[in-house]
Each structure stands twice: as structure tokens, then as C-alpha cells.
């Protein structure tokens, strides 16, 4: 373990097991559930519950694959390290940069959502103004130290978790006590055109947006380098997070869709806030809007942390400028936080230029980057496992269903891309994947050329 203050190129270990569990949980309870679920409900109806169960299973397989690797070798930069070591230098380079871009895009989507939530109270404030204000505040906090991040994220996540549990209990009470009015009945789950009102197709077409909700679970891997005891904390966090996610997602959506017919949900408001607003409970609606706002800020906070650590890892591998591989005397990678913030600031511009379509566009781009990310975790894990078997090493936290689980995940990713190609407004993000891979290829060649030139001198 690293004790005391480190200078130069060491991150400071300051995250406890409670921090790691809640960082992962906080990463997943965010805008995907609170805002993204609205468009899924419109298309899939109550079948959204089945969709979340399927995506949750895939996310769990991915988490266990990453978990197996991280427990054996806990390092900064998380799985790009494994892609590098077990797959090849381009795979490491590409996965690292893709992960960084993924979380920059997630950060942009969350800041956009913050703007939408503020409009619930102040419709006249443009989304770009709210995005700009919270952008400055959260980045300033992250420039303090990792303990502050851990504590802030811990309390952000606690608020979210308690609120979702309270909403499930309160919603359940409204439902079974009769206080929710005549429209609040469990039969809403199958009476309004059936459990799958638009058939299985309606659900399948929404799997990409559902997948957006599960992006963030891999944060467990990123926290490994700053965990006090990765061998114990990572397996514990990985296993417990998935049960909680299923309770929170499936439980909250089942209660929500029983309180009011799904047909009354609109796309641009959080269904959680809308339903209590419709029930005439303005206090609960306002309280829930505070919660969904906290949720978005919490995920954005995780993104700022995650981006800076990923970029730090890339710099240590020699895949990003060396200046980014330094930390200040408190163990904070200031340079990487500032560079990530600079790129994320584009979100303010996107919201200024296209306030209506900003969230949908960013969500589609996130899913494309997430597909690449999860596919690379699964492929890197297969290579990692083969290498360990050849060395005769028995890993301490084996992934589930290897290698079948890996193939199930890869088929799921391919299906999500096909669905996105068929979805208006999302296809563009799939067409950008080959463009992005070409950009990564050029970046990699430039890096190799520079490295050779330095060696020659």
C-alpha cells in the first residue's frame, strides 16, 4: 500500500470499500434511469422491466470479467492495461482513449440532463446556462483531493439510494392503501395494451437506450488503483452492486408503472417526477426533482474523476503526453482534470446550439462508445484468461460462464449496433464508429513514430 503523500507519478490511495461500492452504484443510478427511461416506456410500455433485467444480466457478466482481471492486477487505467498486456499495444491505446471519450460524452449527457431538471422549476433558464454553472462547481471540487471526491460521491449516492428506496416504499403504499386514486393499480402493468404493447419489437428497439443506463458500472475497475484493499473490496462491490441495481431499477419501474398508465409518460421529463406531479403530490414531485438533479450531478462527478484517472493511466503507458502523468503534492492529477474539463466544456456549446436534440445525440454517442468499451473488456478478458491458463494460474475471482458468457456479451453488443442502425437519430453514431477507429489508428501511428524518433535521438 502507498502511505503518506506522493509526488510525481503516484495516485494517492484513499478510497474505502464503502466508497467503491457507492461509486459503482452511483455511476449506474443516474440519467439513464431517471430521464432516459421515459422514451423506453413510450416504446416498450411495462416491458421496460424485462429489458432492464436482460441488460442487467449482460452488465453483470461484463463486471465479473473486468473484476477477475482487476483483482489479479489492480492498476491505474483499469482495463486498457489488460488490453495492452494481453492483446497488443494498439488495443491498449484504442481502449484507453475510447474509455476516456466515453466518459467525456457521459459527462456531457449528464450536464445536459442537469439543465433539463433545472427547467422543471425555472423553464426560462436555458440548459446551457445550468450546464456551465455546475461544470465549474464540480470541477473545482475535484481539484481538491481523492478523499473529498470519495466522500462527496458517497453522500451523493446515499441520497440517491435512500430516495429510490423511499420512492418504492411510498409508491407501494399509495398503490396498496388506495391513496393513489383509482388509476393506481398493479393491473396497469398489463391492462394498457398488454405487458409488451408494441410487441417484442418495441422492447428490442429500446435495448440501446436501456444499455445507456448501465454504463458506469465499470467504474469499479477504475477505482482499483486507489482502493485500500482491492482483493476484498472489488469482488464484494461487483457482486453486491448488481443485486442492488436490479432492485432499484426493476423495483422502482414496477411501482412507477403501476401508479399511472404508461401511456401518460412524456419523453422530455423524468417519469419519476411526472407521475407524482400528475398524482397531485407537488411536494414529492419537487423532492424527486432534487433527487434526479443530485443523480445527474453525482454521475457527472464520477465522470470527472474517471476521465482524469483514465488520462493519467494513458500518460503513464506513454499513450498521452508525459505532462499528464504527474500529480500534485496532494496526489491529485490536476493536469488531466483540466484537459478533460476543457473537452467536456463543448457540452455547453452543444446545448447552446441545439438545446432540443442535445440529450438524444449525446445518448446515442455514449451507447456507441459503450459498445466498443464493453466488447473490448470481453475480448481482453478472453485473452487474459487464456494467458493465465497457459501459465497454470488459477484466478481468485473467476468470471461467470467463461467463455460462453463472453460470447453472449459480444452477440448482445452486435445486436445493439444493428438496433441503433434501424433507429432514427441513432444511426449516425454507429456510422461514426469506423471514423473513430480510423482516428485512433492515425493517433497510434503518430505515437509510434514519435516514440521511434525519440529513441533514435
Residue ranges: model-predicted function:
Residues 12, 35-130, 134, 241-250, ...:
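Extracellular loop-to-transmembrane helix junctions
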Residues 155-156, 323-334, 371-424, 453-457:
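C-terminal membrane-solvent junction of multi-pass transporters and transport-like membrane proteins
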Residues 6-11, 48-49, 122-126, 158-290:
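Helix-loop-helix junctions that connect adjacent transmembrane segments
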Residues 115, 128-184, 214-215, 238-242, ...:
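Membrane-interface loop-to-helix entry segments
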Residues 81-84, 88, 120, 206, ...:
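TM-loop-TM module centered on a large, flexible mid-protein loop between adjacent transmembrane helices
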Residues 75, 98-113, 214-227, 282-322, ...:
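Membrane-helix boundary/coupling elements in multi-pass transport proteins
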Residues 1-8, 81-84, 110-131, 163-166, ...:
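Helix-loop-helix connectors at the membrane interface of multi-pass transporters/channels
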Residues 1-38, 42-47, 59-64, 76, ...:
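Membrane-interface "cap" regions at the ends of multi-pass membrane proteins
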Amino acid at each position: 500500500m502507498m502511505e503518506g503523500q506522493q509526488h510525481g507519478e503516484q495516485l494517492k490511495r484513499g478510497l474505502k470499500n464503502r466508497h467503491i461500492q457507492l461509486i459503482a452504484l452511483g455511476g449506474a443510478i443516474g440519467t439513464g434511469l431517471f430521464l432516459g427511461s421515459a422514451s423506453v416506456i413510450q416504446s416498450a410500455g411495462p416491458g421496460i422491466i424485462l429489458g432492464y433485467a436482460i441488460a442487467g444480466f449482460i452488465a453483470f457478466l461484463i463486471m465479473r470479467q473486468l473484476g477477475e482481471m482487476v483483482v489479479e492486477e489492480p492498476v491505474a487505467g483499469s482495463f486498457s492495461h489488460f488490453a495492452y498486456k494481453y492483446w497488443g499495444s494498439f488495443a491498449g491505446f484504442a481502449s484507453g482513449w475510447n474509455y476516456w471519450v466515453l466518459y467525456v460524452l457521459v459527462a456531457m449527457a449528464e450536464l445536459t440532463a442537469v439543465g433539463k431538471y433545472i427547467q422543471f422549476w425555472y423553464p426560462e433558464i436555458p440548459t446551457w446556462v445550468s450546464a456551465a454553472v455546475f461544470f465549474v462547481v464540480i470541477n473545482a471540487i475535484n481539484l481538491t483531493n481523492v478523499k473529498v471526491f470519495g466522500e462527496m460521491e458517497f453522500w451523493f449516492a446515499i441520497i440517491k439510494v435512500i430516495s429510490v428506496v423511499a420512492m418504492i416504499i411510498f409508491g407501494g403504499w399509495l398503490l396498496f392503501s388506495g391513496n393513489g386514486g383509482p388509476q393506481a393499480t398493479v393491473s396497469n402493468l398489463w391492462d394498457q395494451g398488454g405487458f409488451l404493447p408494441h410487441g417484442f419489437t418495441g422492447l428490442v428497439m429500446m435495448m440501446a437506450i436501456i444499455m445507456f443506463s448501465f454504463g458506469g458500472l465499470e467504474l469499479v475497475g477504475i477505482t482499483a488503483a486507489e482502493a485500500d484493499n482491492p482483493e476484498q473490496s472489488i469482488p464484494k462491490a461487483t457482486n453486491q452492486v448488481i443485486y442492488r441495481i436490479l432492485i432499484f431499477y426493476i423495483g422502482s419501474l414496477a411501482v412507477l408503472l403501476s401508479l399511472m398508465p404508461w401511456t401518460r409518460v412524456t419523453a422530455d421529463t423524468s417519469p419519476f417526477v411526472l407521475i407524482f406531479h400528475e398524482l397531485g403530490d407537488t411536494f414529492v414531485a419537487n423532492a424527486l426533482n432534487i433527487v434526479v438533479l443530485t443523480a445527474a450531478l453525482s454521475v457527472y462527478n464520477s465522470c470527472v474523476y474517471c476521465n482524469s484517472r483514465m488520462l493519467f493511466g494513458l500518460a503513464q503507458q506513454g499513450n498521452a503526453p508525459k505532462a499528464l502523468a504527474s500529480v500534485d503534492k496532494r496526489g491529485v492529477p490536476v493536469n488531466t482534470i483540466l484537459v478533460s474539463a476543457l473537452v467536456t466544456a463543448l457540452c455547453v456549446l452543444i446545448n447552446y446550439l441545439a438545446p432540443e436534440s442535445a440529450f438524444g445525440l449525446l445518448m446515442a454517442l455514449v451507447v456507441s462508445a459503450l459498445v466498443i468499451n464493453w466488447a473490448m473488456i470481453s475480448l481482453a478478458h478472453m485473452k487474459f484468461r487464456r494467458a493465465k491458463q497457459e501459465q497454470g494460474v488459477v484466478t481468485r475471482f473467476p468470471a461467470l460462464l467463461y467463455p460462453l458468457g463472453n460470447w453472449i456479451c459480444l452477440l448482445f453488443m452486435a445486436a445493439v449496433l444493428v438496433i441503433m442502425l434501424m433507429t432514427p437519430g441513432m444511426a449516425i453514431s454507429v456510422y461514426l464508429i469506423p471514423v473513430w477507429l480510423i482516428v485512433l489508428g492515425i493517433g497510434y501511428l503518430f505515437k509510434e513514430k514519435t516514440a521511434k524518433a525519440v529513441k533514435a535521438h
